[in-house]
């Protein structure tokens, strides 16, 4: 059985590293530290030019929950169209109602735009905040998504093994279950063997020091606990280590 490795990235340096490490598919985001937000059009376009493997754009207009208003949905529709215009292969989204159910009317609107633009669709970890994952899986099957990205309702995929295994059974081949959150070379094989998933998702995150010669510590571009002169990047060796472990 061939296991697919999806790597989530939020910069072009990480895209190159993920490809070098052996990724099979890219989830393109901005702000991975916030769980991943919609990437810019320029980022999408350049990623499409660079990548020899499929690239799916995160469609998430803001951090926080997955309860969206009409303005959010309008922006998401435009972003899906932008992903097609940029030359990407798919998109990643999830929309919930206030009670934790999947918002089927709004999700169907987004699916139609994706389908009209021949884009594949991954339903993301919004399912991990659903009120009933079994009902959610049937909803997602009705929508026609290719896969669900999930940690099995847990803080990480390893802790969610039992639910992930149940999700694979419930999906019953209608779509793939993509196990993500905390996947590493140390646990990927066990997650796969105990759940039956055919795809895993990770960032392979690492950091590198800034190449700036002038380092000014007194001015922050964002949160005070973040070092602006440390750059988060995907480590190609971490991706390759997972690939070698699950062969």
UniProtKB/Swiss-Prot annotation:
Main subcellular localisation: cytoplasm
InterPro entries in UniProt: CutC-like, CutC-like_dom_sf
Keywords: Cytoplasm
Keyword Cytoplasm among record annotations: yes
Signal peptide as annotated in the record: none
GO CC terms, sorted: cytoplasm
Subcellular localization(s) per the UniProt record: Cytoplasm
One of the Pfam families matching this protein, by short name: CutC
GO molecular function, one term: copper ion binding
Family: Belongs to the CutC family.
PANTHER family reported for this sequence: COPPER HOMEOSTASIS PROTEIN CUTC, COPPER HOMEOSTASIS PROTEIN CUTC HOMOLOG
Name of the molecule in the record: PF03932 family protein CutC
Source organism: Aliivibrio fischeri (strain MJ11) (Vibrio fischeri)
Species classification: Bacteria, Pseudomonadati, Pseudomonadota, Gammaproteobacteria, Vibrionales
Name of encoding gene: cutC
